[in-house]
């Protein structure tokens, strides 16, 4: 049986031998997880404090880089467990976030996930590269999202796809945008 050839006369094997990855740069892939803690009417959001650069000491969503041997869902589960101690199978995709300048380390595309848990049953334990992991009270009023853990208050307005911080403290990366998108889906 003859091998199928493309318009350049190459078989698939020949094409793959000549294929140049550098002609098509690949982004780094990450998963970020918005963990909403519910207990009755009370809502909380689980954040980690970054232990390293970039954005050292800033609050962020749990998440991290994907390995070539895992799916994005597996990355989300692994990173959530490694950084916070939360082991939850209940995650659902929020969306893909791919602005070219969203991460100072380079072209990083993240698949964001939503995870809903009962926060009274999930103790936050910092691990891996997270310096700290804490539940923040979550309030949403007039398109203003406020996160408060008693020591730090992060407040921002989300309107027409844009984030405007009200507080001095901010979240790392584009995590305010990801949180706002998750809240829209609740």
Task: Describe the residue ranges of each PLM region.
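A short coil-to-beta-strand element that immediately follows conserved catalytic motifs
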Residues: 87-95
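Conserved Nudix-box catalytic region and its N-terminal flanking loop in Nudix hydrolases
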Residues: 41-86
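Nudix hydrolase/Nudix homology domain
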Residues: 1-4, 56, 117-186
């Amino acid at each position: 049986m003859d091998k199928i050839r493309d318009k350049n006369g190459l078989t698939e094997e020949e094409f793959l031998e000549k294929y140049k990855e550098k002609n098509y740069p690949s982004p780094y892939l990450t998963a970020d997880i918005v963990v909403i803690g519910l207990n009755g009417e009370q809502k909380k959001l689980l954040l980690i404090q970054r232990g390293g650069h970039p954005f050292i000491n800033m609050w962020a969503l749990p998440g991290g880089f994907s390995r070539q041997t895992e799916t994005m869902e597996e990355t989300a589960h692994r990173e959530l467990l490694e950084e916070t101690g939360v082991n939850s199978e209940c995650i659902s995709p929020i969306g893909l976030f791919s602005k070219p300048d969203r991460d100072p380390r380079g072209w990083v595309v993240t698949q964001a996930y939503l995870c809903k848990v009962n926060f009274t049953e999930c103790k936050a334990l910092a691990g891996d590269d997270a310096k700290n992991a804490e539940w923040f009270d979550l309030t949403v009023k007039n398109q203003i999202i406020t996160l408060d853990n008693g020591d730090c208050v992060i407040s921002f307005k989300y309107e027409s796809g844009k984030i405007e911080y009200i507080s001095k403290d901010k979240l790392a990366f584009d995590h305010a945008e990801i949180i706002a998108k998750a809240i829209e889906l609740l």
